[in-house]
């Protein structure tokens, strides 16, 4: 059995919602919900929050979770890589789970872990597009090869359907990632790519440098908390049994 760690990067100073990980959601910090749901995923050995903020670390520990203090990091992936180095035993598979996903479904975590077979070094998820999402730049689209590896991720409507209408091949990216521990180190050492900069999509760095990303299917739609309004929606969904 492979040793699997889910590492959740969290920072205090989000520009649109400072202090977001500590925001109250149904009587506990938002970040605690992410930790609790990640622990329900089968095949996970360790769940830890990676942060450079003592307040977040304390809140996680008070809620019964594990927190790893890191230095300042350029990206969440860099923070995850640093935290993975501090775990003992060192994980073989590292899942990078965003800290603003309090409604994450354990099955989505299981799906991305399950994609790490047959020499796959990096994996992520995709779901069917809802009506009207193809044109929305906030929804990242992905197209894949027959093998299931990503051809490209874009905020643009891909693929374009010459016959008109939305292509049944279009899928929305869900931003959960799994890496082998070795490839996580490789990835974070790569120079940022030009397309990565144009699209503001970090995963394009792997494709630009010639590495594959396996894309697995999920029914989880993703629900990140970016604003106080999003938090209110999450409260309503939790109250409804989400």
UniProtKB/Swiss-Prot annotation:
Primary location group: cytoplasm
rRNA-binding found in the keyword field: no
Keywords, sorted A to Z: Cytoplasm, Lipopolysaccharide biosynthesis, Nucleotidyltransferase, Transferase
Pathway membership: Nucleotide-sugar biosynthesis; CMP-3-deoxy-D-manno-octulosonate biosynthesis; CMP-3-deoxy-D-manno-octulosonate from 3-deoxy-D-manno-octulosonate and CTP: step 1/1; Bacterial outer membrane biogenesis; lipopolysaccharide biosynthesis
Protein location: Cytoplasm
Residue ranges the record marks as coiled coil: none
GO BP annotation list: CMP-keto-3-deoxy-D-manno-octulosonic acid biosynthetic process; lipopolysaccharide biosynthetic process
Source organism, top-level taxon: Bacteria
Any one Gene Ontology cellular component term annotated for this protein: cytosol
Catalytic activity: 3-deoxy-alpha-D-manno-oct-2-ulosonate + CTP = CMP-3-deoxy-beta-D-manno-octulosonate + diphosphate
Main EC class the enzyme belongs to: transferase
UniProt-listed Enzyme Commission number(s): 2.7.7.38
MF GO annotations: 3-deoxy-manno-octulosonate cytidylyltransferase activity
Role this protein plays: Activates KDO (a required 8-carbon sugar) for incorporation into bacterial lipopolysaccharide in Gram-negative bacteria.
HAMAP family per the UniProt record, alphabetical: KdsB
NCBIfam families: kdsB, PRK05450.1-3, PRK05450.1-5, PRK13368.1
Family membership noted in the UniProt record: Belongs to the KdsB family.
Protein name in the entry: 3-deoxy-manno-octulosonate cytidylyltransferase
Gene that this sequence comes from: kdsB
């Amino acid at each position: 059995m492979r040793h699997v760690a889910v590492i959740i990067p969290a920072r205090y100073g989000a520009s649109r919602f400072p202090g977001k990980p500590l925001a109250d959601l149904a009587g506990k910090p938002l970040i605690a919900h992410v930790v609790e749901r990640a622990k329900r995923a089968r095949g996970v050995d360790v769940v830890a929050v990676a942060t450079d903020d003592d307040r977040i670390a304390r809140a996680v520990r008070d809620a019964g979770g594990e927190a790893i203090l890191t230095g300042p990091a350029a990206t969440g992936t860099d923070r995850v890589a640093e935290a993975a180095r501090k775990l003992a035993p060192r994980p073989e598979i590292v899942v990078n789970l965003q800290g603003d996903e309090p409604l994450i479904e354990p099955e989505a975590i299981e799906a991305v872990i399950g994609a790490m077979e047959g020499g796959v070094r990096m994996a992520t998820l995709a779901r069917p597009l809802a009506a009207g999402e193809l044109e929305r730049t906030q929804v990242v689209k992905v197209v894949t090869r027959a093998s299931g590896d990503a051809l490209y991720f874009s905020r643009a409507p891909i693929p374009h359907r010459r016959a008109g209408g939305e292509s049944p091949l279009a899928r929305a990216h869900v931003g959960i990632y799994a890496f082998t521990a070795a490839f996580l180190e490789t990835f974070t050492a790569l120079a940022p790519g030009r397309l990565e900069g144009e699209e503001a999509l970090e995963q394009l760095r792997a494709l630009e440098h010639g590495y594959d990303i396996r894309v697995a299917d999920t029914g989880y739609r993703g629900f990140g908390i970016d604003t106080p309004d999003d938090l209110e929606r999450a409260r309503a969904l939790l109250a409804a049994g989400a």
